[in-house]
Amino acid sequence: MSTFVRDTGVNRKSILQKGQGRTRKLAKLAYIYERESRYFAQVAETAKEMAGEELLTLGARDLSFVFRGIWFTAAKKDFYRITYHSRLLSRVLAPLISFACTGKDDLYREARKIRWEEFMTVKQTFSITANVSESGITHSNFAGLRVKDAIADYFRDRTNRRPNVDAKDPDLVINLHIHRDFATLSIDASTGPLYKRGYREASVSAPMQETVAAAIIRMSGWDGTMPLYDPMCGSGTLLAEALMAYCRIPAQVFRTRFGFMQLPDFNPGLWEDIQVAAKKDIQPLPPGLISGSDISEHAVTAAKTNLMGLHFGGNVSVAQTDFRQIPGIADSLVVTNPPYGIRMGKDKDLKGFYQDLGLFLRERCARSFALVYFGEPKYIKHVPLAPSWKKALTIGGLDGKLVKYELY
């Protein structure tokens, strides 16, 4: 990580020639995010509208919606806050340069122009994530390799050494996006996907991704004025995301390393202020407000393990029981992600299963609301209830639908 802090106005040394350094004026060599305070949020298409609302509440402005993403403007403190708090975004990117890119030589040449020693040392590791669409460069892996070569050669020419690539746990993640022969190179502000919260210590087959669960909780409108119950909680992802949302716990509270720490203008004091303010804003979870159950002993154990890693997780009760055996859940929000073909491994008895679920909701959940996520929407028709609404939620590799039922 660079030890220079742009906010002080002190010139940094940049390795501009092999084995030789010299100072340069910062204003002339600023990157896009520095000049324009402009950033890019990657988000699933069906979650984009609510992600935009979330961005605004976290301090973003001047939103511009594009395919699978949102451009936004933010002060540095809000950029840190968004990366730390967002529950819906996949990644937040700080763009460095954009350029016309019609072939591999353009990629290599422009990537070599970036002062990579400002973002990492030759002893640190990096990885490239690349996305290519409607371009003369047709393979994202090939495009990423050209950027990798440019970075490696940049350091080799100046230090006689090449930094290593680490796809699993890199110090720096560089994002390459090419669309219609126009490329942008960015730094991943979180050094990895934001759905990785850090509380998942145990899992079950085909677990729900955290950003999907967070989107469901947000779409439910749940504000803690009624109890929340998940009768098929699996490893507890919906319960955990409901807890974090209610308690106002930052989504990345367990992440200790962020990509924005590698940026040349990183401000440690400002980042500390964001964390302190977030900690003061946390509120406790009343016992009994969030609870769940599952027929599987393994799932219940996994859910308890994951919840105990969270603040106030001990206030969430999880029991082992078949939802068909639950006497009743009145005046509550019932939210769940039932088993489907992918999770069950076969379609046997699933029609009857969903009929039983509908009867349970209708007969034992008086004066409640139910939000049911169907990873395979073909099963919606087998629930003997009339939905209030159905909304697509294609995120985390699932082409699913969230269905709301009002129960009287």
Indicate residue ranges for each PLM-predicted region.
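A short, flexible beta-alpha/helix-coil linker loop
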Residues: 133-136, 192-193, 339-343
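Short SAM/SAH-binding signature in class I
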Residues: 331-337
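A short, acidic, amphipathic alpha-helical segment used as a generic capping/interface helix at domain edges
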Residues: 118, 322-326, 353-361
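Conserved Class I SAM-dependent methyltransferase catalytic core
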Residues: 32, 38, 42, 46, ...
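S-adenosyl-L-methionine
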Residues: 19-26, 33-47, 51-57, 64, ...
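Non-catalytic nucleic-acid substrate-recognition regions in nucleic-acid-modifying enzymes
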Residues: 4, 15-170
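Conserved S-adenosyl-L-methionine
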Residues: 208-328, 342-343, 347-349
